[in-house]
Amino acid sequence: MPYYICNTCGVQHAQTVDPPNSCLICEDERQYIHPDGQTWTTLEDMREKGNLQNILKKEEEHLYSIKTEPEFAIGQTAHLIQHKGFNVLWDCMTYLDQKTIDQINELGGIQAIALSHPHYYSTQVEWAEAFQAPIYIHEDDKEWVTRPSNHIHFWSGETLNMKPGLDLYRLGGHFKGGAVLHWSKGNEGKGCLLTGDIITVAADRNWVSFMYSYPNLIPLPASKVEEIAAKVKPLQFNRLYNAFSKVVKENADESVQRSAVRYIKALNSELFHT
């Protein structure tokens, strides 16, 4: 039986004879059902079509971005961190083929997979099986897992130390279990924060933003944004990578704090009067 994949969000579902009637991810107000209706594919069909490829790009020393071209579903970018012989795949993407597996194995493989939130669960189990790697998801997002697996480990609390210098932090916001990855050795020791879109980079790369639903433009409350900013304030990070190939290259920690203040002012009618 096939593992069907939603064409809109790219998340793979449990094995069924026929396509599911609906997609749990897309029916939620943080995603959307395509105007043309719910459609499905499989990883096998995607490979057979032969029109997709994954592009690995070196972003900085020991950090690679991975993106599918042409864009599929949400179109997110995953990241591979090389950390003292322990490689972490941060967030995931739907398309996986042998070429990608070979390229990543040349870089040392994958020893762990960590997810920011359910929109990027994609074919995480396929990746875990290909590299025999555990998947780390915060327990607050357990209900959104559409393909269960023994590879999945649900972590609890506010932080998870994967290895010295690699830590997951639960920030919530976009999803209750929404997490970011702090890589203290990144950016030549100045620190990197990989955020998915728990914190996203704005069009002006000196600013970031926060949302409950990006496609449906539902903001987060001021109290939650204030809480997110407070949680990352003690962390040292000069650079921030989001899930869509946008980067705050310098002073990212200051950008987050400054952006949170602006966001809260906007919600409280203190930023502008139009």
Swiss-Prot record:
InterPro entries attached to this UniProt entry: Metallo-B-lactamas, RibonucZ/Hydroxyglut_hydro
Gene3D superfamilies for the chain: Ribonuclease Z/Hydroxyacylglutathione hydrolase-like
SMART domains: Lactamase_B
Protein name: Uncharacterized protein YmaE
Originating species: Bacillus subtilis (strain 168)
Gene (name only): ymaE
